[in-house]
Regions:
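Short Pro-Gly-centered flexible turn/kink motifs
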Residues: 66, 115, 209-229
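Active-site acid/base region of carbohydrate-active enzymes
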Residues: 165-179, 267-293, 339-364, 375, ...
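Polysaccharide-binding surfaces and accessory modules of carbohydrate-active proteins
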Residues: 78-80, 84-188, 203-205, 237-261
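C-terminal capping/lid segments that line or modulate ligand- or cofactor-binding pockets
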Residues: 1-46, 310, 321, 356-357, ...
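An extended acidic
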Residues: 1-82, 155-184, 250-276
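Extended ligand-binding clefts on enzyme/binding-domain cores
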Residues: 157-178, 268, 276, 349-356, ...
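Low-complexity, Ser/Thr/Pro/Gly-enriched N-terminal "stalk/linker" regions
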Residues: 1-9, 62, 163-164, 179-182, ...
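Helix-terminus loop motifs that line ligand-binding clefts
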Residues: 66-71, 78, 291-305, 312-313, ...
Length: 646
């Protein structure tokens, strides 16, 4: 339940599953409107040979290998069937310049005899995630293509073999009126040629190949996407005119160009991590919409709290994803993310829980009423990290135009909110939801990010000549730090508290050992790396979780039951947490310890480099979603820390 291959151009995003089949098809936003996200929306691939059809996702004798071999977001899938003596090799991409998904299919006959092999390519959409059964599919004889459309979404499907189009097709219904889908029409090797359906529709193409012994043939297949049938057909025609080899070559060149800032650093990256370093950056880019949203994960197999997926833009995940890009000198992605946050900011200066890729408010399980306390359903750290990241970006690109665009209209209201969202009794930030989205309290983690955000805002105020705000925000940050020293360290246990709530003037302290408290205080400078509190917290954490160079995996916190593999363990390993520990180790010169963590994360990634949200400590299996943008970001950040230590 992961995506071994993801492909994207910031508008069309395709995720392939463990059978090499389309499982996610987002358009026109990365992470929003998944037209192939349902359980029965697999785009099946099959071969008809020796009198029977074999589907890649049904016949258990197919074996698969996945990789990104080209230093570009071009996936390679190899499917082999020993009994049928057939190999299917797919070179897949989403075109960098236009919204079309391309598959260059290499059909290899391993037999000692010449054979007729029929390749079936099937597609099923629920356009715009609609359950209204109002999609239409039609055969377009003048274009040698099939068209699926609903409203302002249109997909044109076609292909060729040696310059000739597919030789048969059919359009059908699935999931309604007793129909399973048009792919059932392929079981005798022949398609009926039904040319139109409306409702819940799917379609299938056939390519008939005569393949000599120990030889091969190629089939080109594509799905173009448009906001109208005219646009989708224009892209289809453009692809036919250019040829898919030219488009794949142009896409590879685009990715090489995009990777240029990272390639400049590559000589300094330890050889063992170079491939995953580059793959992580490309995978992160694949999760970024061209209008600024940074999606947590486009892997739709994971339903968060069993009701929703991770295909939203959390400002926190976006901030952490952009940190290594900012350090590498990227400009476009951070700028567009800040524009996205600017558009989504509440009039009171805070950011909400999460957003859809189109900028609308995302679903939430956080209430406005918390017992008798009324408070916005937010996580304060998400506002603070955007202020902090903007200051990091400005430090890399000190441009007066940046302040003109964002200082008065975004930084000032955000920093004012942070400075005033403070509990008068404790001096700490008021309660909000923690970064794990579970607990309403004042956490050490959120306090740390708020402190750093206010200091960052004060530094920006100096540059903007805004003396009054500079004094106010710096004072607020210093007061919060002093309150944290007073309240947030558990001297008895020798570790930071997870957080606290104040009831009738008395603190109710949460003593859970939460690794975000330790590493948040470290990353955002709330406590010095060599302070007594930090040193003792790391020692307590190391002992509590029995962490070592041979077992560097760490959970989020003790007794974390979220998707826990077994009640016998305290929680699943999270690469994010382990990599934070590696960053702490590098700060203290422990390169060996950091290397152990990097090896651990690399060894648990998929063959294409996908890093998941969690790892099962019992069988070392990746736990979806994969990829998780934040996991990849922390891997890249750790590598950059390692380079800086040198």
């Amino acid at each position: 339940v992961a995506r071994p291959i993801v492909l994207s151009n910031g508008e069309l995003h395709v995720g392939l599953n463990k059978f090499g089949l389309v499982h996610d098809f987002y358009y026109p936003y990365v992470g929003f409107e998944n037209h192939a996200g349902g359980a029965n929306l697999r785009h099946k691939v099959g071969v008809y040979v020796d009198g029977a059809v074999s589907w890649l996702d049904e016949d258990p004798k197919w074996s698969f290998r996945f990789e990104y071999p080209h230093t570009a977001l071009i996936g390679h899938t190899r499917a082999k069937h020993e009994d049928l003596n057939i190999i299917l090799e797919f070179d897949d991409c989403v075109d960098s310049d236009m919204s079309v998904f391309i598959r260059n299919v290499h059909v290899v006959n391993l037999s000692d005899e010449s054979r007729e092999i029929k390749l079936f390519m099937h597609q099923a959409f629920a356009i715009s995630e609609s359950g209204s059964n109002t999609d239409t599919a039609q055969y377009l004889p003048d274009s040698d293509a099939l068209l699926h459309y609903r409203g302002r979404r249109a997909f044109v499907i076609s292909g060729d073999h040696n310059g000739d189009p597919f030789d048969q097709f059919s359009i059908g219904l699935f999931g309604i009126e007793g129909h399973e889908g048009s792919y059932k029409d392929a079981e005798d090797g022949e398609l009926s040629g039904n040319s139109v359906e409306h409702g819940r529709v799917d379609s299938i193409l056939r390519f008939t190949l005569n393949v000599p012994a120990q030889s091969s043939e190629r089939v080109h297949y594509w799905v173009s996407a448009g906001m109208s049938t005219r646009e989708a057909l224009y892209i289809h025609k453009q692809l036919q005119d250019d040829g898919i080899h030219e488009r794949i070559h142009a896409t590879a060149a685009w990715w090489h160009s995009w990777l240029a800032p990272a390639l400049k650093q590559l000589d300094a990256v330890p050889v063992a991590y170079r491939e995953l370093f580059l793959h992580s950056l490309m995978i992160m880019k694949s999760q970024m919409d061209k209008r600024g949203a940074v999606i947590a994960s486009t892997d739709s197999t994971m339903l968060n709290y069993s009701r929703d997926a991770y295909a939203y833009s959390w400002p926190r995940d976006g901030g952490f994803a952009l940190w290594p890009l900012i350090r590498l000198g990227y400009t476009d992605e951070p700028y567009r993310f800040f524009e996205f946050c600017h558009r989504g900011m509440h009039p009171s200066g805070y950011l909400m829980h999460k957003y859809r890729a189109d900028g609308a408010l995302g679903s939430s399980w956080h209430p406005y009423l918390h017992g008798e306390t009324v408070a916005p359903p937010i996580q304060e750290d998400e506002t603070a990290i955007v202020v902090f990241m903007f200051s990091q970006y400005y430090a890399m690109h000190p441009d007066a135009g940046l302040l003109k665009d964002f200082y008065s209209s975004m930084i000032v209201p955000m920093a004012e909110f942070l400075a005033e969202f403070v509990d008068s009794e404790s001096g700490l930030p008021k309660p909000s939801y923690d970064l794990w989205e579970q607990d309403f309290m004042t956490t050490t983690y959120s306090t740390s990010v708020t402190y750093a955000g206010l200091l960052a805002a004060a530094d920006l105020a100096v540059i903007a000549g805004d003396h009054a705000h500079e004094v106010k925000w710096r004072t607020a940050a210093e007061d919060i730090q002093q309150a944290a020293r007073t309240h947030l360290f558990n001297t008895e246990r020798g570790v930071f508290y997870k957080g606290a709530r104040w009831e009738n003037g008395q603190p109710v302290l949460d003593t859970t050992l939460d690794n975000s408290s330790i590493f948040g205080a470290f990353l955002f400078g709330l406590f010095a790396p060599d302070s007594d509190e930090m040193t003792r917290s790391i020692a307590t954490m190391t002992e509590q979780f029995a962490v070592s160079n041979t077992q560097p995996g760490l959970p989020r916190y003790e007794n974390d039951d979220y998707r826990r593999s077994d009640d016998s363990i305290t929680g699943n390993y999270w690469p994010i947490i382990s990599l934070w520990h590696a960053q702490y180790k590098l700060e203290h010169g422990d390169v060996e310890g950091a290397t152990a963590v990097l090896d651990f994360v690399k060894d648990h990634a998929l063959t294409t480099g996908m890093i998941s949200e969690q790892i099962n400590p019992l069988d070392n299996e990746a736990i979806a979603p994969a990829p998780l943008t934040w996991s990849h970001a922390e891997f890249v950040s750790t590598i950059l820390d390692m380079i800086e230590r040198k």
